[in-house]
Amino acid sequence: ALSPNTNAAAARVLDRLGISVTPAAAAGCCGALDFHLDAQERGRQRARRNIDAWWPLLREGAEAIVQTASGCGAFVKDYAYLLRDDPRYADKAHEVAAAARDLVEVLRDEPLESLGLRCDQRLAFHCPCTLQHAQRLGGAVEAVLRRLGFHLTEVADGHLCCGSAGTYSLTQPALSRRLRDNRLDALESGAPDVIATANVGCQAHLDGAGRTPVRHWIELLDQALPGGE
């Protein structure tokens, strides 16, 4: 719900590849923000609600639960641990966590060259902590972007946080802004046309500085589709 443009772009790209997307209308926030705010039981309740929303689709043959925000994806992949002591949900949580995929895990195995993208932008990619550290998918998006012909600039200290860090930008704004400015200095050092990332929190935080535009990487793919914007 925080990034409808991103989800719509993902659906269009997946559709071009012959992958159908079934929205789960009853699914909502993954619960990560509740855990950031020390409201664990409320977060577990959100996890249970999402499991209830996704479960019928898995039973009907859905192959994956695809996340476009790496922070949400990392948290959903942890549902099995979060609900391990819940006798009603432990088994379901294990199956849901096993089905969770970041978008790049789906796209990297597809014949992306068939999309015929027009890629003439210089990109700097900010790899979110939740993608490279939590999900251990560092380099995966960059590999897809290069494979499709985007020019990626060199970015120093790519392992560092942008300062968003869940709710950190709200609870520690001064330090968060300092981390953001340091990250933007590194990202802008190669004079990119746009900065790409893979998490809505990072995107909003970096873009909030009003410097180089920051977009989710799937929106850039969608824009580069033949007939795209």
Regions found by a protein language model. Give the residues of each.
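Iron-sulfur cluster-binding electron-transfer modules in prokaryotic oxidoreductases
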Residues: 1-229
